[in-house]
Amino acid sequence: MENMLVAIDNEYPGRNYKVEIFTEELTALCPFSGNPDYYKIRIVYVPDKKVVELKSLKYYFVGFRNERTTHEALLNKIFEDLKNVISPKYLKIELFVNIRGGIEVTVSREEGETLEKVD
């Protein structure tokens, strides 16, 4: 599915700025029950030479709709794919799992230079 993501040139590659993306339109299937899992996802990155084209990101998310996957695997798949496509200076992804059975779960991963200068 990585090939669904489109990278476009960063028009300001010499500048440190952050891009923050948030959506509630991410679903996948529980690998055990087959029931849908609903997610909110927050992506924060400091671009280098490329940025992600947002329509391609939306279609990429839709591609998970019928995939059986754990929360942890989903987070790491999205993280690796985005990292491979745009090679950001910094990347953080938080995956908020819709509450099920009274349990609230958030999984996250981050790599790269800190955002201290751009916060």
PLM regions and their residue ranges:
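N-terminal intrinsically disordered, cationic/polar leader segments
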Residues: M1-D119
